[in-house]
From Swiss-Prot:
It holds the Pfam family CC_BshC. Residues 460-484 form a coiled coil. Keywords: Coiled coil, Ligase. The keyword Ligase applies. This is Putative cysteine ligase BshC. The keyword Signal does not apply. Involved in bacillithiol (BSH) biosynthesis. May catalyze the last step of the pathway, the addition of cysteine to glucosamine malate (GlcN-Mal) to generate BSH. HAMAP family: BshC (MF_01867).
Amino acid sequence: MEIKEISVPQQGVVADYMNGKKEIQSCFDYMLTEDAFKQRVQDLREREFFRQDLVTHLLEYNTKLQAGEATIQNVKALGDENTYVVIAGQQAGLLTGPLYTIHKIISVLQLAKEKEESLGVKVVPVFWIAGEDHDMDEINHTFVTKNKKIKKTIFHDRNPKKASASESELSLEDCRKWIEEIFKTYPETNFTKDVLQFVDDSLRKSNTYVDFFGHLIMKMFVNSGLILVDSHHPELRKLEVPFFKQIVSKYKEVQEGLHNQQEVIKELGYKPIIETKSNAVHIFMEIDNERVLLEDNQGKFVGKDGTYSFSYEELIEEMERSPERFSNNVVTRPLMQEYVFPTLAFIGGPGELAYWSELQQVFHTIGFRMPPVVPRITITYIERDIATDLHDLQLQERDPFLNNVDKLRENWLSNQIEEPIDDRFVEAKKEIMNIHTSLQQFVKEIDPGLSAFAGKNEFKINEQIELLERMLKRNVEKKHEVELNKFRRIQFALRPLGAPQERVWNVCYYLNQFGLDFVDHVMEKTFSWNGKHHVIKL
């Protein structure tokens, strides 16, 4: 594997944050400097965490996932007051979801290792599985290439329930068939059988979406020391009850903090991402198997426009009795993470970084400082045949990332013809229409009754010219079919659906192509934190 860095244009908060713009950096409590990380360690030492209870839960949970010895030792290390975490999170996508989930985990592992060495304290990697998520449409699919098209392949569970990812039971046979259909779209390789077995081993041990995700990730990173946590695990929810109570008692201050910080963001010229009602409580409650967002209504906590209503005392009582019924929204999830873990750094994608910039005053309302927010590592893989296609078309590796591939294709095609087809036909139509306009005027003067027919005649002539143009373009494309197919392959591989590769393709394709140790080989690489995009030639 050969790794290169390229500068890819970014926009908005992420671009300004990485470029060191002071205005946006002031929306975060720590710069990404070594001194700032040292200060973060000192700040965390002044706080108390329920470490032993957390260790007990994480040992049980990660052991159930058949964690490696390095993970078990890292969990135990969390009981020490001088141990901290680097953390990231994601929904429990089937087959682990898009590649960026894997890249987030690699980011967590690398930063934890780097900071442990530079700060001289124990730093462990943690990945937070968003088990409370009820939106199955976000996690129940993957993309494949089929019949020279990119196809979204959805897993249709025959017994769907309106439950969280932690509670939604998987129909194992249905899921197994879905996985087999996906692998049929991959080339048969020496690794296919082993990868299918690898996936099926995880599936057989799983009852829910989160189980399947957790087992797959743990098997993939079994020797890395990665700690997994299911954010909606009933035992974890019990530990979170005191903080849920705190949120309920301070929800007005939380909403005010969010509003004030969003005003700051607006003044800096950015558009806020988080949308909430002014009476939001920022907590979900599970009612009749549905995740209901609570709102304030004249001192009562209501859901679904008043369909459900609770007094403060009733809500607190229910939290103590059934904590697993409660979960956080986009505003309070980072707060809960901060409450549970001694977080040295949070790693997020571009969208997460943008919405965290809106939370600074929310953190302060609770008495927290926002942890250092580190943009995750971004990666694109270039297979050998794609590298050959780029070379044959005289394209640089950076070109598909800096330009629209369709535009590159059009430019290349135009260069194969002495005079651009579009320009020549525009000129021809203009000349012909000028002549025809004069001709119509002549016809109208002699016989006004033929005016309508003359107009139709103009339309027909235009239609025939456009048909000729289309036929010419089609024949030119057929003549250069080999080269144009190379552009299509480049687009599918590097910019599928016009998006970054890591937002569309799944890691199983690469495991099938390069073996079960593919992720291990990627982890051996050293990635920089300078905001540049990493291109790995395979």
